[in-house]
Amino acid sequence: MSKITKKVYPVMGMHCAACANNVEKIVKKQEGVEDASVNLAAAVLTVDFNSDVVSPEQLKDAVMKIGFDLIIDEDNSMEEQEEAEHSYYEQLQRKTVVAWIFALPVAFMGMFFMDFPGINWWMLVLSLPVLFYSGHAFYVNAWKQAKHFTSNMDTLVALSTSIAFLFSLFNTLYPRFWYEQGLEPHVYYEAATVIIAFVLVGKLMEEKAKGKTSMAIRK
C-alpha cells in the first residue's frame, strides 16, 4: 500500500504568478507526487506525495533546478524562512543601491554627453557592475527557466537588457561597421542599466509587502 504524505513547505525566490506556476509544474512532474499547489501570497507549497517513491530532498532539488528553493526542515521551517527572507531583502537592498549608483551616471551621460570623445567606453565600464552584480540573478534564473522550457519575469528582464547591452557593446567595439554604411553607431547602455535598477526597486517593494502579508497569514 502506498504511503501518501501531505506536507507544506516554504518556497523562496518567487515573485509572480508565473514563478508559482513553474514551481507547481516542476513538483507535479516528479514521480510519486500525487498533487501540488502553491500559495504565492504565503510563499508555500502544499504537496501530496508517496514518501516511498520521492523524498523531500528530491523535491527540493527539483525546485532548485528552476531557480527557487524549498525549506524542508520542518522543525525550524518558520525561523529558517524568516531568516532567508531577511537575508534576501538585505541583499536586494545592496544590489538596488549599487544599480542606481551606476545607472544614474550612465543615463545622465546618455542624455547630455553623447558627443563627448570616448563616452561609449565610459558608459560600458559603468554598466558592468549593474549587469553583472545587481542584475546577475536575472540571468541565472532566466537560464534555469530556459533549460526547462519555462519563463517568468526574470526571462523578460534578462532578454531585454542583454539585447540592449550586446548591441551597444558591438557598436562600441566596432563603430566602423556603421560608419561604412553611412550610419551613426548608437548605444543603449542607459536602457539596460535603468531597466535593471527600476525592476530591482519593484522587487524590493514587493518583497517588503510580501513579507508583511506572509507574516499576517502565518499568524
Language model regions located:
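Flexible metal-binding regulatory segments at protein termini and peripheral loops
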Residues: 1-118, 153, 210
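Transmembrane helix-loop-helix hairpins at the membrane interface
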Residues: 91-219
